[in-house]
Amino acid sequence: MAGEDYSFTVFSKNAFYAELNARLVDLADVKSDLRVLDLACATGGVTRLILERINRTRDTVVIALDHSQTALKTAMEELRDISNNAVQYVQGGVENVSEVVRDSVDTVVFCNAIHYLPDKDKVIGDISKAIKPGGKFAFNTSFYEGGQHEDSAAFYNKWMFKAFRILRKEYNLKPVRSEKVESRRQLSPEEYGDLLERNGLKILKQKVDTVQVPIEGWLDISTFSDFIEGTMPGVPMDKASAALQEGIKQTYAELSVTHVPRNWLDIVAVKV
């Protein structure tokens, strides 16, 4: 099966995903920054977007940080045509950014991962320490209170109903709801604002980016471990993924749709 390692890589290759991240980088306005950190950079898709927009000087540094050595090696290969010695690859987790990145940065970009942080206050506080006064923290997420577009309620309800029925019928399994952890709770935009303010950051720009997601996007997100575990906690990964994918196919066919809208929350905050 494509995405059998259950990583985010398969989903991240979707064209619409690159486009929505490009809009976040544009919103952050990094062109005059000297030091930019791409947090949880994975294979370098967002790092490339930053490199394409930044005005390079001798002192320009784009830091690509990820916990996975394999992802960083792939990023090095993927960015070879554009990096031109401006990229610094750093292996480390998002939990200790200020220790790993010793010199403060102008901007931190953190795409589609903030919702997975178990202790958001701790991590955002540490990110804030790594940013220069007046510097920016830009992030986006589709997993927030408001991510489900109002026109897609029927799609989600039908998809989940079908996926759970397939799981029960084909595998005699059901999710273990007690295993759904607090970090999976989706914050509202207001709660994100409070989170930022508690950690010395103030919202500068905020917008909702509505994206038309094709069937491939939903099939691919159904191969990503964090999404699978959040949707079907306690179910073996392969069976949960198969049920979600078959549910998607049946739902798209039944509704006769080609795309389903999904909202992404884009926020750029400034360190005060």
Predicted regions and their residues:
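Short alpha-helix
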Residues: 184-199
